[in-house]
Amino acid sequence: MRVIMAEVFNSWQGEGGSVEGSAFGRRQIFVRFAGCDLHCAWCDSREYIDASRVSSWRYEVKPFTGRFEYRPNPASVEEVVEAVLRLDTGDIHSISYTGGEPTLQVKPLMALMERMKELGFDNFLETHGGLPELIRDVAPLTDYASVDIKDESAKATEDWKGLVLREVESIRILKEAGAKTYAKLVVTSETKVENVQWYASLLKGLAPLVIQPREPIEVSQAKLMEFYREAARIMGRKNVGLSFQVHKYLNVL
């Protein structure tokens, strides 16, 4: 079985804050898949959106060195497993599957998750959540999940509200399968408080929410506090947190 990869590397998980399901501050091995069906305005992996144009993938030769070697796409599942094992430092919290959107290649994703389970690792899924029918396949293999709630300002798709409802359905599927799951909302200066209230009402009693300002941070502290306050009012004060891309401040991937 083969998969169109982007990269494999060892780093800290820099997102997620302190809500249940987050691995913030934990060391992970990141397995980044190529290909995404959305086009978010703030995407920081834009070079990997069109999987057909990702002719090679890279893997870190030694943890935290930033030294990579390249191989042609598509990769075999065993090649990816070998790259992961080469980066196991003995203190790995979980394997993070990210993208792009990993569920678009659901069969090799499941094969990798199954193999990592056999090797004793926990699986951490980072997903936009817009494909609940595929989430249903991977949910039983998932220990932790970060699921996006795409704000209207992301301009990810024309059917924005439909996307949000599918994301919430994916969260429900993951929670029912036993995965520790949280929702991640990236906010901007264009984010509307009434939209944050809507997201919070959908997530109430289902999963915690982290609010993450887009980098570089442009949203005001006053607006950020308003978003937080309104989400906490609806969801409960212990079910909301802030998230920042701390790995960028540490100058690591």
UniProtKB/Swiss-Prot annotation:
The record describes how the cofactor is bound as: Binds 1 [4Fe-4S] cluster. The cluster is coordinated with 3 cysteines and an exchangeable S-adenosyl-L-methionine.
Q: Name one Pfam family in it.
A: Fer4_12
What does the entry list as the binding residues for substrate? Answer: 12-14, 32, 98
Instruction: Give the catalytic activity.
Output: 6-carboxy-5,6,7,8-tetrahydropterin + H(+) = 7-carboxy-7-deazaguanine + NH4(+)
Q: What is its EC number?
A: 4.3.99.3
Q: What happens when the gene is disrupted?
A: Temperature sensitive growth at 85 but not 93 degrees Celsius.
* Top-level EC class: lyase
What cofactor does this chain's UniProt record say it requires? [4Fe-4S] cluster; S-adenosyl-L-methionine; Mg(2+)
Enumerate the SUPFAM superfamilies for this protein.
Radical SAM enzymes
Q: Name one GO molecular function term.
A: carbon-nitrogen lyase activity
Q: Where, by residue number, does Mg(2+) bind?
A: 45
The pathway where this protein functions is: Purine metabolism; 7-cyano-7-deazaguanine biosynthesis
**Binding positions (S-adenosyl-L-methionine):** 100
Q: Which residues bind [4Fe-4S] cluster?
A: 36, 40, 43
Q: Where are the transmembrane segments?
A: none
InterPro entries reported in the protein's UniProt record? 7-CO-7-deazaguanine_synth-like (IPR024924), Aldolase_TIM (IPR013785), Organic_radical-activating (IPR034457), rSAM (IPR007197)
Q: Which UniProt keywords apply?
A: 4Fe-4S, Iron, Iron-sulfur, Lyase, Magnesium, Metal-binding, S-adenosyl-L-methionine
Q: How does it assemble?
A: Homodimer.
- Describe its function: Catalyzes the complex heterocyclic radical-mediated conversion of 6-carboxy-5,6,7,8-tetrahydropterin (CPH4) to 7-carboxy-7-deazaguanine (CDG), a step common to the biosynthetic pathways of all 7-deazapurine-containing compounds.
**Which HAMAP family does the protein's record reference?**
QueE (MF_00917)
Protein name, as recorded? 7-carboxy-7-deazaguanine synthase
Which source organism does the UniProt entry give? Thermococcus kodakarensis (strain ATCC BAA-918 / JCM 12380 / KOD1) (Pyrococcus kodakaraensis (strain KOD1))
